[in-house]
């Protein structure tokens, strides 16, 4: 009885006259000698995964548990029998399939660490062992790159929701928290019409928009600039000195609204739009390797100046972003950036502009 109710949930239903396909599947990544067994989907002509590289797996059959489905699909597609495996998470897919209809699917993700048997030819495509560090060179769905990383990093059991529109990943939610997406820009700083999840942007080095807000005060010998020290928990350049306040422009947002929000979130400064003076645009690239992952940053920044009186003892710092702040003479800062006098992620040519 309970199964019949469950089965009814994952049948076709109608919304405003259009069918929504619903189902449950498994996807399995088999590992051996630091390689994954990947399936290149090139055999079927009408295949939503045509030419993509994926793991092995498929749809549940009547009465199957996730493990039943996993064992059966792995045997059918590879000839192997898993002997050690992890149930890594649930991935929810919502896709328009490039049509006016939606498909809604729940996928059980498995990492198979040990197995027995010999690999056979697969009717779904071509099986190939691929070194883990070369997986990202393959033609993967963008969302696959996210759950592959979570699987590889062995994060606790997770729930990931992926939304696709006309084949492009347009939204993702990890354990109930929406992931951030950016507009992808061309070389002239214009929006291309594509959006992309934040971590994938920094894996690929895509051009994206940011805002930089410099807080400046006049002194007897020139100007002081307010620097923030990035939190040690930051995913890039932890513990480095940086611009007074900065942030990414989320997909669909504008630079000024982003700058006002970042000032308030990071420092507790509630500025008025007219108090932020746009001084220039800046394009910069800065790469690194953090926590074992390559980080490629290529940004086009709208740079603002804020010159209202600021008492740093009264600032409300966002602790997960900012460890501390301090004033520094502008010329001294330029010299320290040049000679590496302080750990920093500041663009020298930007701070020299004003």
Protein language model features and the residues they cover:
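Acidic, metal-coordinating catalytic segment for phosphate/diphosphate chemistry
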Residues: 10-28, 33, 177-220
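Short, well-ordered beta-strand micro-motif
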Residues: 30, 109-113, 129, 215-217, ...
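Conserved Nudix-box catalytic region and its N-terminal flanking loop in Nudix hydrolases
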Residues: 36-76, 164-177, 198-210, 221-261, ...
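Short, solvent-exposed loop/turn segments that connect beta-strands within catalytic domains
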Residues: 48, 99-102, 218-224, 293
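Short, well-structured hydrophobic secondary-structure segments
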Residues: 61-96, 100-103, 212-216, 256
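Active-site segment of metal-dependent pyrophosphate-handling enzymes
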Residues: 79-117, 132, 232, 268-312
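Nudix hydrolase/Nudix homology domain
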Residues: 121-180, 239, 245, 280-354
């Amino acid at each position: 009885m309970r199964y019949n109710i469950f089965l009814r949930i994952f049948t076709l239903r109608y919304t405003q006259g259009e069918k929504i396909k619903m189902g449950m599947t498994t996807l399995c990544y088999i590992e051996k000698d630091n390689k994954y067994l990947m399936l290149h989907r090139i055999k079927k002509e009408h295949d939503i995964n045509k030419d993509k590289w994926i793991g092995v797996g498929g749809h549940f059959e009547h009465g199957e548990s996730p493990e039943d489905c996993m064992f059966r699909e792995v045997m059918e597609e590879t000839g192997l029998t898993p002997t050690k495996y992890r149930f890594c998470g649930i991935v929810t897919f919502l896709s328009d399939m490039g049509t006016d209809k939606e498909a809604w699917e729940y996928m059980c993700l498995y990492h198979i660490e040990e197995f027995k048997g010999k690999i056979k030819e697969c009717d779904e495509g071509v099986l190939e062992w691929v070194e883990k560090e070369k997986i990202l060179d393959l033609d993967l769905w963008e969302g696959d790159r996210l759950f592959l990383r979570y699987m590889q990093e062995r994060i606790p059991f997770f729930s990931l929701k992926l939304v696709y529109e006309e084949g492009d990943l347009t939204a993702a939610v990890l354990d109930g928290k929406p992931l951030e997406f950016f507009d992808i820009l061309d070389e002239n700083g214009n929006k291309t019409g594509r959006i992309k999840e934040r971590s994938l942007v920094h894996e690929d080095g895509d051009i994206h928009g940011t805002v930089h807000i410099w807080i400046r005060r006049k002194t007897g010998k020139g100007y002081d600039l307010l620097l923030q020290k990035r939190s040690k928990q930051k995913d890039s350049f932890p513990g480095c000195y940086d611009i007074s306040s900065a942030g990414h422009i989320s997909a669909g947002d504008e630079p000024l609204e982003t700058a006002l929000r970042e000032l308030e979130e990071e420092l507790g400064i509630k500025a008025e739009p007219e108090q932020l003076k746009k001084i220039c645009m800046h394009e910069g690239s800065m790469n690194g390797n953090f926590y074992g992952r390559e980080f490629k940053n290529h940004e086009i920044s709208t740079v603002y100046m804020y010159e209202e009186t600021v008492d740093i003892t009264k600032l409300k710092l966002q602790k997960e972003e900012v460890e501390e702040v301090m004033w520094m003479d502008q010329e001294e800062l330029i010299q320290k950036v040049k000679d590496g006098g302080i750990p920093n992620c500041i663009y020298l040519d930007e701070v020299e502009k004003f």
